[in-house]
Structure formats: C-alpha cells, structure tokens
Amino acid sequence: MPEVWLGYGDSEIILDIKYENILRILRPEIKVISPENLRLNIHNNINLQNSTLVLITTPFPKMLDILKIINQLSHELDIELPDVFVLSKPFMLRLRQDISKESLSIARIEPDELIKKISQYRNVILIDKIQYDPVFGFAASPTKLIRECYPQVMNQIYATTLDELPKPGLSGEALKITMETLSELNCQMIHVYSDREVIDSIYFGHDINSFLESVKSFKEKTSTTSDFSKSAFISSNTTYTSQLNLGNSLNLLWNNYHSVLEGGTIVLLSENRGGVNEGAISKFVEGRLDLNGLDKYQYINEIEHIKFLQLLRDKYEIILISTLPQIYLNKLGLKSVSKIKDGLDLIFTKNGKYSKSNIIPVSEITMVKNNPA
C-alpha cells in the first residue's frame, strides 16, 4: 500500500488505501528556491529603510525564512529592524513555538488597529502566501485586508455573489472591487507560493495591482487535470490556520468540490481545534440566522459558507473528520466520522470495494481542472 499522509490540524494522519483505489493524487509540483536565491531576490526587490512596518496578513511557516532575511539585510544596511506584525487572533501554540525557536520579534495586531498603524510608518511591506479562495478567486494580502478592515466593501462584494457557486481561481467582480478599493495603498508586496516545507516562488510588487500578475503565475503553476471522480479526500496544512476553524476547512472544500461528480462523496479533513468562528456559522447553528433573509443581510463573517452549503449540500455527500460536536454539523447538513478509515469504508459501501477516489492533499494551493466527462 502507498503511504498517503494528509494534514490534520498541526499534524498528519495516514490514509490506508490501496493503489487500485486511488484515481489520482492531485497536488501541484513544488520546486525549491535555494536559500541563496531567496536572499538575492529579496535583496534586489525590496526597499528597506528606517520606519518600516512588515505586516503578515496570514501566518504561514515559510514567512519565518523571509523575516530572517529582512532582518539580516537591515543589519547590513545599518538601519533599525522593521516592526513586524501579524494580522491574527491570539497566536496558536505551534506559531508561538516557531517564532520563539527563530528568536524573532513578532507582535499581533487586530483589524481595527491596522489602518491607523500603517499610517505611522514611512515604509510598509505586506507579506502573505497565495491561496485559492471561493469568493475572491485568490487569497493573499489584498483580500485579507478587505475581509478584515473594510466591512462596507465586503457588503458590496457580498451583494455581487448572491446565488453564485464558489469561484476559486477566477478573477471576477470581487477581485476587481478589491483592486479598486486599495488602489491608493502605498506599500510594497511580497506574495509567496509555498507549501509547509519549501518556497517555490516569491513575487514582488510596489503597488496593489502587482497581485494580479502574482496570481496569474500561481494559477499556471498549481493547476492540474483529472477525470471526474465519485469520491475525494480533501485536506491541507500549509498555513497555521488551514484547519483552525470550520470556516477555514470549508474553504478547502469549496476550492475543489467540483472535481467530484454530483451525488459523490467528499471526505474533508477538518480538525477545527478553534471550533466554529464567531460569525454567520455560529449564528446559524445557534438558531440566530434566518436562511430566508440571506439576500437581505449585510455581510457577516463567513456567511458565504452558509450560502454555498444551501446550494451544494444536497448535491454531494460531505463527510468531515473533525473534533466538532455532531450536533453542530447536523444543523449544517454535514456528517462526521471519527477516523479517516471510517470515511473510506463509507465510500466502499456506497461505490464498491474497487471504486477509485481522488486525493487532494493541499487544496488551498491546488486547482483541479476536470477532463470532459
């Protein structure tokens, strides 16, 4: 049997599956940029000076390599080290441990403090990891800023997505609105294509529109093709928050649910030690969200997941491997099992012991394109 390891929270678990039951393992090829080339790229493309703010909009493991190089270059230039902030809720244990291990000084900042903080510095550098996103098409610094700091813009974007299916990998109206809103933002940008272990590519820009070129290259590198499958296993753990809460995990689902035939089964690894995020999902499971009024609401955090579930949960059997109480998942129309083997057994019961599944280990950096049925 092959060893297929899938991310589950901060760890990995093995999917004990035979070769003959695997249609394809769908993941992008990730090349490794050498430490020397990484340093050279940062040296040649980033302006460092006194009064510099470095903002990480999504914490991810390989950000630490970039921050160490920025600090080294600052020492060589004999300038003050930049102030580094992460746009984050209280740091997860793994993130705190990794920061401590590297002896880096990184502080946390809340969204309501951020815009004022940016105005206090002469030089601002935004850093993030590019991922797929079912609302914006792609996620990184620009979209994270809109989600966290521009509620009125999110209302506008939400109004354009009503009754629409997830659109990962498409540069549509939501991304257009994002670019227009942030067009006057004066900053440098570093966007990264990486998994948990290595960096493949690093993209630089000196205005917000550079993000569009970054995601174009990212999509070319991370798209893969496959036949439709009757079932799939979807997971990821390439950021510190990939499966932190249910909303994070559902993003993984929406990015590649389309690789499965309607009526098929999707097993989603969704540890969710952070539970259900404060927002639309928690309001719904507590009976405080009227589904008949979704088109009348202003944007509530993660309301897109309620909308997508309404559109898709009757078309697929969605099974979660999760620590969340089943009573929560029942209200969302989702099933759960305690072990990944139980998910595989349910697929065999439904489709037969010779059925084949697609396996998508890093769904936030994978775009599956289906061959014609």
Please place each PLM-identified region on the residue numbering.
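Conserved, well-structured core segments that form the ligand-binding/active-site neighborhood
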Residues: 102-236
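Short acidic-hydrophobic, aromatic-tinged amphipathic segments that line or gate anion-handling sites
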Residues: 30-38, 102-110, 206-210, 334-343
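Well-ordered mid-protein domain cores that form the structural environment of catalytic cofactors
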Residues: 63-113
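Histidine-anchored nucleotide/phosphate-binding helix
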Residues: 59-80, 249-260, 266
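N-terminal amphipathic/basic leader segments beginning at the initiator methionine
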Residues: 1-37
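Short glycine-rich or small-residue beta-strand-to-loop segments that form or flank ligand, phosphate
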Residues: 50-64, 85-88, 233-235
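Glycine-rich phosphate/diphosphate-binding loops that line cofactor/substrate pockets in enzymes
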Residues: 38-55, 75-80, 224-231, 259-262, ...
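C-terminal non-catalytic interaction/assembly regions of soluble proteins
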Residues: 249-250, 254-373
